[in-house]
Amino acid sequence: MIDFHTHPVLIQEFANKYPNYIEMAREVFQIGNNFQPLETFLLQMDVAGISQAILLPIDCARARNHSVSSNEQVAELCGRSSRFVGFASVDPLKDGAARELEHCVRDLGLKGLKLDPSLQDFRPDDAKAWSVYEVAEALGIPVVVHTGMSWAPRTALESGQPLLLEKAIGRFSKLNFVLAHFAWPWVWEATALSLKYPNVYLDTSC
């Protein structure tokens, strides 16, 4: 079994190594008191019958002053265990986002893209994001997009509405989009997108 949606935010080794790691966990996710060694994380995967985990960072530095793990941290974790598969995250509204994505895939070995319009404070139908989608399509990697409700403070529910992705889904027909969390509470809208477009998949993570 593969856990397709894992945010590596409570790794003790990173809390010890990176000064802002604890602050990030508290500021973005309102957590940060139960850090655990990487070995414990792997043991928990064993207990749950999970063979591999997809690690998803979120580059929300512009909107939140922090990133939910960096691309380099995810690549480091993947180097520590073959049971991890890392995705990259870039902020579509930042200059050089498309080039950064290409670097993450070609140089860091990351295998996909994670976007979170709610935490990153952008609309997924913003044409400024087109260059990022275009590079992802050219690289042949999937993009996981947070859809549905976000519990994080100071986030707009509208940003998680899956229908905001329809223009991009139609325009970039060779790019596979994974709608995270089944877009709850917009489950029917997400279902309709997945039925209409062959490049749309649904992630059932809570």
Which residues does each predicted region cover?
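Catalytic pocket-lining loop regions of alpha/beta-barrel enzymes
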Residues: L108-G112, R123-C206
